[in-house]
């Protein structure tokens, strides 16, 4: 069976959508889960019901909760969660040409003298 190429998503990643929603709402004490979902539904062409688990997962991991517990709380953007501009792509380093290893030399075992037992009387 041939693999089909998946179509590129028509929306940005959930992480960026949630962060822009929280920043766009500009609520002083943080934005609620419902408000974040409404903002995403209004500004992006997505099915929020399908993205709900991903939104919840991102909020748990990257966003600071200011009030309440779970979905009933308010959320603010963590300073670390704000997406930073990516640095210029690094050029891949030239691969070093490995020299073929010479065959390992076999060690010849020297003839050893047999150990003599000491008489302990």
Curated annotation (Swiss-Prot):
PROSITE patterns: H15 (PS51504). InterPro entries: Histone_H1/H5_H15, WH-like_DNA-bd_sf, WH_DNA-bd_sf. It is found in: Nucleus; Chromosome. CDD domains: H15. GO terms for molecular function: double-stranded DNA binding; nucleosomal DNA binding. Keywords: Chromosome, DNA-binding, Nucleus. Histones H1 are necessary for the condensation of nucleosome chains into higher-order structures. This is Histone H1A, sperm.
């Amino acid at each position: 069976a041939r693999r089909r190429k998946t179509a590129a998503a028509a929306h940005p990643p959930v992480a960026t959508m949630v962060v822009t929603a929280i920043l766009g709402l500009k609520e002083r004490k943080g934005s609620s889960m419902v408000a974040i979902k409404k903002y995403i539904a209004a500004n992006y062409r997505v099915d929020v019901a399908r993205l709900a688990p991903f939104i919840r997962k991102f909020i748990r991991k990257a966003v600071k909760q200011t009030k309440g517990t779970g979905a009933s709380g308010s959320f603010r953007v963590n300073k670390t969660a704000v997406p930073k501009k990516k640095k210029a792509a690094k050029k891949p380093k030239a691969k070093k040409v490995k020299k073929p290893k010479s065959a390992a030399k076999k060690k010849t075992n020297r003839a050893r003298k047999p150990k003599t037992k000491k008489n302990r009387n």
